[in-house]
């Protein structure tokens, strides 16, 4: 470093500087280890380093710099030391000039070196100044520079001190010592961090990430994360303990960049349609895209993230350079060990160089991993955000082709697989580069014999690519089966009440397990091929070694197998082995990623809502018409036929327009067209002013009442109170434990159906919009509540008076109150006008009213104004009827935190008091995974298979050890006349051991994968059984999202991750045993270093596992919130768009994703912290093994020395991967904990009992007797039904009525044993229902619920789930419900596939299909639980006529809101507060003028 020094030590010549002018052939070691060469390299490398990287660094900080730093004491000291070094080198350059001036000749380098270092030190000092100006607090560039600068002064200091020539040249010594002191001081100061900038552009977060405050060594080693790891080791981590998210990692920043590039790329595609970009017909289901659409998305991802990826790739390339330096250094080291005359310092230097090379390889590799992991995190955030934004703009046709479960599966599985593939992208080219470099090394070692290695390797490549191709086919098959299973599971969990009511659990379990069996079959085949692929690469490595050694010893002239050839070849082959083992895994991951990427790209290309489908303009006071449609023709999608034709409609300001028509006429489609949800084929649609929308099926969010009503609007308490009172929610909210702040639960699980509908209406009213579009908001309400809500809100004197209202309704009694009535039929406007005008026309409206007329008992001359006593006389009583607060219910229709489709309102539990229960949070376990979890998994694998697997791993590892040791013996064989005597024998046994190892490796890996598949099958069956056997209360308390997480994400981990982590752990653990034995046998002294290193490893592992397991669990729970919000938005996207609330919803998604990022980032940093520190500790073992070999050189053979050091070079990676594999396995084992969460939950009664089989014809008559019956829905709630004693005769038709909360539905639940009796009991035909199995009981009773439920699958499957009827019987049932013509028109007829839950059918059509399903069951007892509440009166007449014909001899229980429905019953039960208040015929009850009479008055029947 010092320019004064000569190129050799004082008194020692450099042989005329032969380093620079060498003509004689010398050994390689001479060139690389000559002190003159090392000193020359040390003199020129630091300046070259700084002058090459410095300008690039200056440009970077100029573009990315922030506020300047204050002139701190640290900066001042750095500058003073810099100027001191400048003065020193000025002096060193001046001395030779002075001597030349005095006539003393000087070597040119004595002047050149100080001059170069003078300019370099000046540049370094300038960089210190510029870093302060640009706000750089810790410099990695200068840290590396000062570190390099220490090399030559340190060597010179040692040599000069040992030479003892201070008196001869004191000035030279002092300059060298001063130079070293100053450089070391600069190095120490560069490890410190400067003060923060004077003025910060961003406000400082509460808990900033310590990376910004860390020094360069701390950043390189990830020591800045140690505080969080120590905190996680000492206590449970909470949100406050996690670091705040940096802006560059936030969702808002990342998604906006990717979306911008995605839109730009998509708009450049030929055939792009212009609006929004997306026009793929929805019939191309995104799960199975027919053509690749990945191009635009791939280009967008590359443009956004390429800089991070390329920088990481550069780090990886540098790391690999040091990786391949190790075999070269090992070759030099073994050359040193074989040369008895070489000096000892050469061995020490080589040991240090091997250690430094291994350390630099570790540091650069971990920097690559860190950057790629951060890139993965950012990419996951960006793509998830892109999917969420796509959900907000999906067209109605696209939504029908992709259920919420598919979308959530897309985010939770496909996005994850895509981001994981980023790590393997470089494997496609870099691993091939590894292989080439390895073959070059082999050529240098073994000469032309290495060519045989190329031949062997290339001959095996086609086999491996064939295996990979076959495996990708089975992988795609598994993905298809998995998606099918996810859809069916989601549907089952959403409709579990219907399934249990009918006793269909076994049929669905059989269907689901059949799909699961096909999925596991594909998984087993894929795992088998994966094992073959790995073993084939292992065999190819062994064959390379065998053929190369055989050819070399038998053919080559210099055929002796010495230590250098043997063990350097082994080291090179170990690198080759890693490349060949990692290559199929990389290909496998990329194949998976390609499938997932295609699914993502196809989803992002689905058809969007046309922004030009409806023109929304600000309100103008002068305008008379608020809504206008001119010659409008609309379709659901590009490929479907138009559903509305020739619509011409004008709605003036302040008008109440009622839209009526038969089922399937297009009423809801008209509102969708006005909202811009339908594809506009021709015409125009315009709306003036803001819009509020009330959907037919209520959609509420998992928030409080007030947040649902305000819906991102500012809180106005007086207006909120007025809205709640008008919507008949005031008394309900007052009864809630937290008032308006009471959480409603997921999908309103704490509310009844009527409450949810009124809450949905209140949300629209609170909006104070100019235009209101309401899709049958009164259908789910009791008659008196319906009247009240209409009068207070919708009607002429309601809160919405003066606004423009379009009301789609089946409630015909409101029609006289409407300003205009529009009648739709077959997608066209049949007629439009005022109520009186349409009556006089005697057209379509009159036909509707006639269809709703009572079948009998009304004279021909009755005026149409009183066409239906219930429907049209609703306002005759005058005044607002009094009503009690409707009691909320727990619902099984909670939205799925992983998957749900259209919200379904199951039969209302109208008598459960609210208890303030919120949606259940997903369980999060803390601490280490319990040993019982491992034991349960191993029991699922099976003890014999576990023992057999361990034995196989031991056998193959013994074969591996013997193979390496046999090679060391071969290398030590004496050489006679240039040949070894036993080469053939050595080669034959070497080949035999390699074959045994390959066989054992395949058998052991196949055993692990087969055991994993067996365990996965049993655990899934157990989870499915535990959930299916749970009572209905379990589903009311457990959000479906939590269940879907177990059935999707956690099951995927058990299927794939755990077997793979188990295989990795066993491979490395047994490999560690082999390495430990090898090192201990060759150099026993190394054991002294191994033991403390093992203690340090244990300490690092304890810190890491305690924190990482917590972070993993927190991350899983937080990601559930992201999935839940995504599913919730998918269900309510039409409402969100109608309210123009896309912005707030996007912001909420970004906030949830950012919270998940706050957990993901510390977890990936903890991974790097572990890897970097453990590998550095392992690199220390390399140094110990090498130094032990140097110390034992006198009595250690070259073969044993090579065996020791080459084994030590492997232990670093092996030890690190043992810890990582164990930790990954423990993290994955959390999934086993979670799938076993429901093992100990209460289960319902047995499905089948032996006593049931003895009565196959039960019940014969259908007599039902309640004896002092009572039940409560949960232990903490009051009795919902109590003291009910009555007998219903066989064949009797009994109506059950009562106000909301009276206990009507609870009676039927008790009859079906959905809720077990708390007191008393129920007898059917004299047999207690508790003596019958649940399936026996439920299969003998038919229930038609209020809301129709269909399942994914064919129409025939939906009608005859148990396949008990012929096609003729099914067609007869369809003809009875007047659906035969409709089904005949469907493609495939009975084999027509219902999408989702029959989303492509109208509510009325679905209800008629459910009726046909009931007709086919042919049971003696029929329950209609509000079955006609959601259909128009005409459909209701059809249903009643069919029921009267098919169930004339059956016992019928009819629960009804519409009293008209029970007027033909032989007896009516009036429920009040859980008891039977009145019982008798309708005429008797009306004559008593009791509760039934009051209800009839409210309905206009009395």
Swiss-Prot record:
Record note on disruption phenotype: Deficient rats develop ectopic mineralization in the skin, eyes, and the arterial blood vessels. Plasma inorganic pyrophosphate (PPi) level is reduced by 70 % in deficient rats leading to a lowered PPi/Pi ratio.
Superkingdom, taxonomy of origin: Eukaryota
Membrane-spanning residues: 38-58, 79-99, 105-125, 138-155, 174-194, 301-321, 348-368, 425-445, 449-469, 532-552, 575-595, 939-959, 997-1017, 1061-1081, 1083-1103, 1175-1195, 1198-1218
Record keywords, A-Z: ATP-binding, Cell membrane, Glycoprotein, Membrane, Nucleotide-binding, Phosphoprotein, Repeat, Translocase, Transmembrane, Transmembrane helix, Transport
Residue numbers on the Extracellular membrane side: 5-37, 100-104, 156-173, 322-347, 446-448, 553-574, 960-996, 1082, 1196-1197
Catalytic activity: an S-substituted glutathione(in) + ATP + H2O = an S-substituted glutathione(out) + ADP + phosphate + H(+); leukotriene C4(in) + ATP + H2O = leukotriene C4(out) + ADP + phosphate + H(+)
NCBIfam families to which the protein is assigned, alphabetical: MRP_assoc_pro
Class of enzymatic activity (EC top level): translocase
Protein name, UniProt field: ATP-binding cassette sub-family C member 6
PROSITE patterns referenced in this protein's UniProt entry, alphabetically: ABC_TM1F (PS50929), ABC_TRANSPORTER_1 (PS00211), ABC_TRANSPORTER_2 (PS50893)
Side Cytoplasmic, residues: 59-78, 126-137, 195-300, 369-424, 470-531, 596-938, 1018-1060, 1104-1174, 1219-1502
Localization of this protein: Basolateral cell membrane; Cell membrane; Lateral cell membrane; Basal cell membrane
GO cellular component, one term: membrane
Segments for region (Disordered): 854-909
Tissue specificity statement from the Swiss-Prot or TrEMBL entry: Predominantly expressed in the liver and to a lesser extent in kidney, small intestine, and colon.
Annotated organism of origin: Rattus norvegicus
InterPro entries for the chain: AAA+_ATPase, ABC1_TM_dom, ABC1_TM_sf, ABC_transporter-like_ATP-bd, ABC_transporter-like_CS, ABC_transporter_C-like, MRP, P-loop_NTPase
EC number(s) stated in the UniProt entry for this protein: 7.6.2.-, 7.6.2.3
Disulphide-bonded residues: none
Family statement drawn from the similarity comment of this UniProt entry: Belongs to the ABC transporter superfamily. ABCC family. Conjugate transporter (TC 3.A.1.208) subfamily.
Native organism taxonomy: Eukaryota, Metazoa, Chordata, Craniata, Vertebrata
